[in-house]
Amino acid sequence: MTTETFVKDVKPGLKNLSVLFIVLETGRVTKTKDGHEVRTCKVADKTGSINISVWDDLGNFIQPGDIIRLTKGYASLFKGCLTLYTGRGGDLQKIGEFCMVYSEVPNFSEPNPEYIAQQSQNKQAQAESGTGTNSHNSSSPAPPASDLENGNGSNSSGPPTHQSTAPTHSTSGRITRSQPNHSIPGAPNSVSNGKEPRRTGKR
């Protein structure tokens, strides 16, 4: 038999939960595209309250004041809010009414900034791993990642990276023509790079 979990100990991703709670409120029924009925109920124990999402006929039988034991449940985030669900083979069993010590606060289903930040980081990590170039940059230290967020990595790094990025952004034909001119000692004025003549003109 699994040990009972208090509402305060429920965390996203936990599975096979056994929770004893009292029903405080039963929410409105919403229908999914598949035709299932979903009802969100506010439940509580002595450590706090949380929302539970109940599907189909089970939701019709739940009433405020019912004391219920959830077995084989799991916890997940829904729109940034911690929510309990009945898992596969999970069960809601009414074991009494009204007589239970509970606390409505803290409400663990209120939007939690930590969970929202964690979800956004996970989404960014998935987006970066989806493309080949971003996955290489995501493995480098934090400052290059922030440079990527700013747009160009060359803006924050100064002229050395600007010079190194200029050949990669220009066409390869121009690079091969300008490189031999750099190797000739007497030809600094004949450089074909568009940016360098402007610099020499400013001096």
From Swiss-Prot:
Protein location: Nucleus
Asked if the Swiss-Prot or TrEMBL record annotates the protein with the keyword DNA repair, the reply is yes
**Residue range(s) of DNA binding per entry:** 22-92
* Main location as per UniProt: nucleus
**Top-level division of the source organism's lineage:** Eukaryota
**Matching Gene3D superfamilies, A to Z?**
Nucleic acid-binding proteins
Name a single GO biological process.
response to ionizing radiation
Renumbered to this chain, the Polar residues biased-composition regions fall at 117-128, 149-182
User: SUPFAM superfamilies of this UniProt entry?
Assistant: Nucleic acid-binding proteins (SSF50249)
Q: Which UniProt keywords apply?
A: DNA damage, DNA repair, DNA-binding, Nucleus
Which stretches of sequence are listed as region Disordered? 111-203
What's a Gene Ontology MF term here?
single-stranded DNA binding
Signal sequence extent: none
Assigned protein family: Belongs to the SOSS-B family. SOSS-B1 subfamily.
- This chain's protein is named SOSS complex subunit B1
Source organism per UniProt: Xenopus tropicalis
